[in-house]
């Protein structure tokens, strides 16, 4: 199973939305949590390795590097040459925003904001890739490379300015 994938070919975008939300912005509002980020190409290599070398019935976590959201946005700014100011959002305010989102949903208004989503932003979804490295002989690339690939792909497809 992969963690949060970053890389090229994210046409929707799905996980790449985190890049679009922070790219080129002078001010980025940053939740207190974090997550494990993995390069999408590493996930593809991991699936092939699991099929070739994995043990039947075993599960392998395809995980890259653990970053707080603040660390991720600092890295994004560094890789893209932008200067940004991070404003840390306290967990209590995200819980209030989530409750408001739930009320809007009950009123029939569509919203991506919910208590559950806000709670997830406040925790550290951190994992280890030790088992996949040991048993599948995988090597994971740095998150910086995955960010570079994603940004280049978004620019090429007009989703970010060139």
Enumerate the language-model features and the residues they cover:
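Flexible, glycine-rich beta-alpha linker
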Residues: 1-15
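Short aromatic/basic micro-patch
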Residues: 37, 66, 126
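A conserved pocket-lining segment of Rossmann-fold NAD(P)-dependent short-chain dehydrogenase/reductase
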Residues: 18-38, 46
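Structural signature of the Rossmann-like NAD(P)-dependent dehydrogenase/reductase core
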Residues: 1-4, 36, 61
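Mid/C-terminal beta-alpha module of Rossmann-like enzyme folds, strongest
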Residues: 46-111, 129, 134, 143-162
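Active-site loop of classical SDR/Rossmann-like NAD(P)-dependent oxidoreductases
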Residues: 113-128
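Short, glycine/charged-enriched secondary-structure capping and boundary segments
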Residues: 12-15, 20, 75-77, 102
């Amino acid at each position: 199973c992969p963690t949060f994938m970053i890389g090229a070919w994210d046409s929707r975008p799905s996980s790449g939305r985190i890049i679009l939300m922070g790219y080129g912005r002078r001010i980025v509002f940053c939740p207190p949590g974090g997550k494990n980020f993995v390069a999408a190409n590493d996930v593809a290599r991991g699936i092939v390795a699991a099929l070739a070398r994995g043990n039947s019935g075993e599960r392998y976590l395809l995980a890259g590097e653990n970053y707080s959201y603040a660390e991720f946005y600092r890295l994004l700014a560094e890789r893209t040459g932008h200067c940004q100011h991070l404003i840390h959002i306290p967990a209590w305010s995200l819980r209030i925003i989530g409750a408001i989102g739930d009320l809007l949903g009950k009123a029939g208004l569509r919203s991506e904001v919910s208590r559950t989503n806000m709670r997830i932003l406040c925790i550290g979804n951190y994992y280890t890739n030790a088992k996949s490295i040991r048993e599948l002989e995988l090597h994971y690339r740095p998150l910086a490379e995955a960010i570079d690939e994603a940004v280049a792909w978004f620019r090429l497809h007009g989703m970010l300015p060139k």
